[in-house]
Swiss-Prot record:
PANTHER family: GLYCEROL-3-PHOSPHATE DEHYDROGENASE (PTHR11728), GLYCEROL-3-PHOSPHATE DEHYDROGENASE [NAD(+)] 2, CHLOROPLASTIC (PTHR11728:SF1). One of its GO terms (biological process) is carbohydrate metabolic process. HAMAP family: NAD_Glyc3P_dehydrog. It is an enzyme of class 1 (oxidoreductase). It comes from the Bacteria. Sn-glycerol 3-phosphate binds at residues 118, 147, 149, 203, 256, 266-268. It catalyses: sn-glycerol 3-phosphate + NAD(+) = dihydroxyacetone phosphate + NADH + H(+); sn-glycerol 3-phosphate + NADP(+) = dihydroxyacetone phosphate + NADPH + H(+). NADPH binds at residues 23-24, 44, 118, 151, 267, 291, 293. Belongs to the NAD-dependent glycerol-3-phosphate dehydrogenase family. This is Glycerol-3-phosphate dehydrogenase [NAD(P)+]. Catalyzes the reduction of the glycolytic intermediate dihydroxyacetone phosphate (DHAP) to sn-glycerol 3-phosphate (G3P), the key precursor for phospholipid synthesis. It comes from Vibrio campbellii (strain ATCC BAA-1116).
């Protein structure tokens, strides 16, 4: 376990600093603080953070859920980063590198960085670990937290399970100790750092496809087939990158995929529903009102599949709908019209 350290601006031991005060970052911070730990929640908009402190709640994203007393609201990045050895970065994937670069000058010698961001680097499709290495080098321990979690349910204290992976086994053990709550939040250790990062990105894309299928009106049979074949595409890409096959049958693979494809709490699924009902991309995004990670993830995953030479027909058709203006019904027809294949291919 990490030793207590009260030598910071707050005069108390800070178990973790959460970077990102959106719905998921806030819910993770709430869950950590409910374990009795002192937790900092940092956000980049001072006015928003002032509202959170005044209300002691995030009414915009998590209405009706009060903050624990041990949750500290902060808009000063230097103070937040310096206060805790362990950072949990929870920001959209397209700003992950920007935020990490902002944190870099304030990192401690013993800092360890975990992220719950799901996605790849914009325009390149690189894994976030590669982005992190480019920015901060290889002297810091890195970890990824991923699995089937809706922010509201987590913040409400409803039962949830998730996985954490890192090349540093001691960091994994510490994260399990800090995050795990035997009553509501179970944290599994995983040693597949690559697969854990990939699952969260690909499932967002497949969830858009599941929503499109339902929006068109294809029903449960088609949705289930799409989820199953989407899992096959995820596994093929993972194999090409050196991931472990069993990872995609776990929390960060099948678990997150099923959750995101079948429940309308998922923005990616709702985005796909709107597209399937004939709405254009801009209108569909406006209806959601929050970041739809799967929109950017689709381009990132498509680029990665092209670079690795991995066939991903579902991802390819969703990419054509989002970025080339293809009609969702035509995309579905083209998927069904593909040459006959063995299921394992």
């Amino acid at each position: 376990m990490t030793q207590a350290n009260t030598n910071n601006a707050y005069g108390k031991d800070i178990a973790m600093t959460v970077i990102g005060a959106g719905s998921y970052g806030t819910s993770l911070a709430i869950s950590l603080a409910r374990n009795g730990a002192n937790v900092i929640l940092w956000g980049h908009e001072p006015e928003h953070m002032a509202r959170l402190e005044a209300d002691r709640a995030n009414h915009e994203f998590l209405p009706g859920i009060d903050f624990p007393e041990s949750l500290i609201i902060e808009s000063d990045l230097e103070k937040a980063v310096q206060a805790s050895r362990d950072l949990l970065v929870v920001v959209p994937s397209h700003v992950f590198g920007i935020v990490l670069n902002s944190c870099k000058p304030f990192l401690r010698e013993d800092s360890r960085i975990c992220w719950a961001t799901k996605g790849l680097e914009p325009e390149t499709g690189r894994l976030l670990k590669e982005v992190a290495f480019d920015i901060i080098g290889d002297s810091y321990s890195l970890a990824v937290l991923s699995g089937p979690t809706f922010a509201k349910e987590l913040a409400m204290g409803m039962p949830t399970a998730i996985s954490v992976a890192s090349p540093d086994s001691a960091f994994v053990a510490d994260l399990q100790e800090k995050i795990h709550c035997s009553k509501t939040f179970r944290v599994y250790a995983n040693n597949d750092f690559i697969g854990m990062q990939l699952g969260g990105a690909v499932k967002n894309v497949i969830a858009i496809g599941a929503g499109m299928s339902d929006g068109i009106g294809f029903g449960a049979n088609a949705r289930t087939a799409l989820i199953t074949r989407g899992l096959a595409e995820m596994s093929r890409l993972g194999a090409a990158l050196g991931a472990q096959p069993e990872t995609f049958m776990g929390m960060a693979g099948l678990g997150d995929l099923v959750l995101t494809c079948t429940d309308n709490q998922s923005r990616n699924r709702r985005f796909g529903l709107a597209l399937g009902q004939g709405k254009d991309v801009d209108t569909a995004q406006e209806e959601i009102g929050q970041v739809v990670e799967g929109y950017r993830n689709t381009k990132e995953v498509w680029m990665l599949s092209q670079r690795m030479g991995v066939e991903m027909p579902i991802v390819d058709q969703i990419y054509q709908v989002l970025y080339q203006g293809k009609d969702a019904r035509l995309a579905a027809q083209d998927l069904l019209a593909r040459d006959k294949k063995a299921e394992g291919k």
